[in-house]
């Protein structure tokens, strides 16, 4: 009977390609993580600007109301 086992030889060429593929996967992983963090921070900044603007509008209206009340007194 013939022995039909498969042998993988770990030559210098194999390690070169393995390292290249591994580095590409790591760079892609960091790109995805960086994109997600940037999107989350962008969304948080948009929400913060909205709250800040609405607070400024309320404060401005409150100050206008107080100045109108003082003018009538």
UniProtKB/Swiss-Prot annotation:
Effect upon mutating residue 60 to R: In strain: ATCC 51908
Keywords: Glycoprotein, Host cell membrane, Host endoplasmic reticulum, Host Golgi apparatus, Host membrane, Hydrogen ion transport, Ion transport, Membrane, Phosphoprotein, Signal-anchor, Transmembrane, Transmembrane helix, Transport, Virion
Virion surface side: 41-73
Variant or mutagenesis effect after changing residue 26 to T: In strain: ATCC 51908
BP-aspect Gene Ontology terms: proton transmembrane transport
Effect of residue 73 to E: In strain: ATCC 51908
GO cellular component terms, semicolon-separated: host cell endoplasmic reticulum membrane; host cell Golgi membrane; host cell plasma membrane; membrane; virion membrane
PTM text: Four species of SH have been detected in infected cell cytoplasm: a 7.5 kDa non-glycosylated form (SH0), a 13-15 kDa form that contains one or two N-linked carbohydrate side chains of the high-mannose type (SHg), a 21-30 kDa polylactosaminoglycan-modified form of the protein (SHp), and the isoform generated by alternative translational initiation. Of these different forms, SH0 is by far the most abundant protein detected during virus infection. Tyrosine phosphorylated.
Keyword Transmembrane helix set for record: yes
Membrane-spanning ranges: 20-40
Protein origin, superkingdom: Viruses
Record's signal peptide: none
Effect noted on mutating residue 67 to L: In strain: ATCC 51908
InterPro entries, alphabetized: SHP
Glycosylation sites: 63
Record note on quaternary structure: Homopentamer forming a funnel-like pore. Interacts with glycoprotein G; this interaction occurs on the surface of virion particles and infected cells. Interacts with host BCAP31 (via C-terminus); this interaction is direct.
Family in the record: Belongs to the orthopneumovirus small hydrophobic protein family.
Protein name in the entry: Small hydrophobic protein
